[in-house]
From Swiss-Prot:
Its EC number is 2.8.1.13. The keyword Transferase applies. This is tRNA-specific 2-thiouridylase MnmA. It catalyses: S-sulfanyl-L-cysteinyl-[protein] + uridine(34) in tRNA + AH2 + ATP = 2-thiouridine(34) in tRNA + L-cysteinyl-[protein] + A + AMP + diphosphate + H(+). The record marks H125, Q378 as: Interaction with tRNA. Gene3D superfamilies: Adenine nucleotide alpha hydrolases-like domains, HUPs, Translation factors. The keyword tRNA-binding applies. Disulfide bonds join C100-C200. The gene is mnmA. GO terms for cellular component: cytoplasm. It comes from Christiangramia forsetii (strain DSM 17595 / CGMCC 1.15422 / KT0803) (Gramella forsetii). The active site is at C100 (nucleophile), C200 (cysteine persulfide intermediate). The lineage of its organism: Bacteria, Pseudomonadati, Bacteroidota, Flavobacteriia, Flavobacteriales. Residues 95-97 are annotated as: Interaction with target base in tRNA.
Length: 395
């Protein structure tokens, strides 16, 4: 009998995953990860991990499976929290959920599970795995979940073949409504529980409060750049080379204070991210202001009016070579090669038609249509036929 450790998070998805695996005849162990101690920055009096841990324990009890808690808060602080602070300080916007899966759930946690004699680790992610042989070697595919509305393959875009080989996704074929129905039929305490929101494992966190622990607030100005700014003019360029053209399509606008007018003050450019609308506290404009860029060195936030402002859009992005990751290493392209794909630059974004261009220094992703708020530090993931092939950090 194969042994599976299920990461029981105290939510309905992992609860039903554990139930399904038990039904399929696996020996199932429930393991709850405690990853956060600091309650000073969570919103309201929620202490999410305590409630979640109790719910996970009750589910394990109901299913008659052994249950343990592991405290990974130290690794979590080192690998996720510190990384987040560093990224925000550099003016990048990290994605804690993608990191959490790569660094914690499918690394630290997986190693603990395997040391307990597990053959597999299972999670409640809405995605699927398939396997086939190529040249005598097994190849593992990471596929979108059947529930289009809930597909979470994006969060797993940094997984490796080794990690996939040891992973099971029991609810990947189901719709969310079916998962809740199973939980209700089995009288699991999590059946009606709301989906968790917020930073992976931390519960509801006020981001500025969270960041203020490490990043000092510092007053700066908010500049509004008019849509008619010269830098948005389309010029006819004769590119000397393909690389020149790729660089042009993916380069960000470089703003100066003289590009617009000062319309307000802020408490730190590193608290803001591209596309953000809330928290600017500037009124009196016909259309709402959106962040189009942040300059953490000069501590300036550049904004534009309305969601169609040209400063929001860009047609391409670049990934440094050491941040290009192929889930399907066998499909990686060589320098000067191209690949037609579909890509997304954030969770739940509908897939966009694009082309990958591999160069010696890294990968360009050029979209057929300009994309809103391409954000440094976030992940772009690329797909073909519902399979996630690879990903990278937007630089």
């Amino acid at each position: 009998m194969k042994k599976v450790v299920v990461g029981l998070s105290g939510g309905v998805d992992s609860s039903v995953s554990a139930y399904l695996l038990k039904e399929q005849g696996y020996e199932v162990i429930g393991l709850f990860m405690k990853n956060w101690h600091d309650d000073s920055v969570t919103i309201s009096d929620e202490c999410p991990w305590l409630d979640d841990s109790n719910d996970a324990m009750m589910v394990a009890d109901k299913l008659g499976i052994p249950f343990q808690t592991v405290d990974l808060s130290e690794q979590y602080k080192e690998r996720i929290v510190d990384y987040m602070f560093n990224e925000y300080e550099k003016g990048r916007t990290p994605n804690p959920d993608v990191l959490c899966n790569r660094e914690i759930k499918f690394d630290v946690f997986m190693k603990i599970a395997l040391s307990l004699g597990a053959d597999y680790v299972a999670t409640g992610h809405y995605c699927r795995k398939a396997e086939f042989e190529k040249d005598g070697e097994p190849i593992y595919q990471l596929l979108s979940g059947e529930d289009n509305n809930k597909d979470q393959s994006y969060f797993l875009c940094q997984l490796t073949q080794e990690q996939l080989s040891k992973t099971l996704f029991p609810i990947g074929e189901l719709q969310k409504s079916e998962v809740r129905k199973i939980a209700a039929e089995q009288n699991l305490v999590t059946a009606e529980k709301k989906d968790s929101q917020g930073l992976c494992f931390i519960g509801k966190v006020r981001l500025p409060d969270f960041l203020q622990q490490k990043l000092k607030s510092k007053e700066g100005v908010i500049v509004e750049v008019p849509a008619g700014n010269d830098s948005y003019l389309e010029e006819d360029i004769n590119f000397k080379s393909k690389i020149d053209q790729l660089q042009h399509l993916s380069k960000k606008f470089n703003y100066q204070l003289t590009d617009g007018k000062v319309v307000g003050k802020h408490q730190g450019a590193h608290y803001f991210t591209k596309g953000q609308r809330k928290g600017l506290a500037v009124g009196g404009t016909p259309e709402p202001l959106f962040v189009i860029d942040t300059d953490v060195i000069e501590n300036v936030i550049y904004t534009g009016q309305g969601k169609d402002h040209p400063g929001i859009y860009r047609q391409g992005l670049f990934i440094a070579q050491d941040e290009v990751h192929w889930v399907r290493r066998d499909l990686a392209i060589d320098s000067d090669e191209e690949l037609r794909i579909k890509a997304r630059i954030r969770y739940r974004q509908p897939l966009q038609d694009a082309t990958l261009h591999q160069t010696e220094n890294g990968m360009y992703v050029i979209f057929d249509q300009p994309q809103a708020s391409i954000t440094e530090g976030q992940f772009v993931a690329w797909y073909q036929n519902g399979e996630l092939l690879g990903s990278g950090v937007i630089s």
